[in-house]
Amino acid sequence: MAGRNLVGPEADALDLGAVFRALADEHRRSVMTELAADRSDSERGCNSFNLPISKQTQTHHFRVLREAGLIDEIDYGNRKGIRLRRAAIEKRFPGLLTLLGAESPGGTAPR
């Protein structure tokens, strides 16, 4: 069954303030760090992230990431998949994903 793509703004329209607001939350940053580490950029199910929050809160966080232009969501009706917008992010903000990869799993940059 083909899903309906829910996409954020075009690469040239990505706003640094919106991106920083999206990445300010530790749960969203954790999702982005996991996605950035997977160089295959394959689609992942929203439930594949080990987030200690409710489904409703997860839905909110994925929407914030999508609206900031960091991920695409694919709506299959009874589930959603997400995919990192690596090319768009690297085009607009080169090095941002590398910075995310430098963050340790505990949520702070290594010293």
Describe the function of each predicted region.
Residues 18-22, 26-54, 76-88:
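N-terminal helix-turn-helix DNA-binding core of bacterial DNA-binding proteins
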Residues 45, 57, 102-104:
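Juxtamembrane helix-loop transition sites at the ends of transmembrane segments
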Residues 47-68:
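Canonical helix-turn-helix DNA-binding module
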Residues 1-17, 33-38, 75, 85-111:
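Amphipathic alpha-helical dimerization/coiled-coil segments
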Residues 25, 61, 94:
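Conserved acidic functional residues
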Residues 66-76:
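A short, conserved structural fragment
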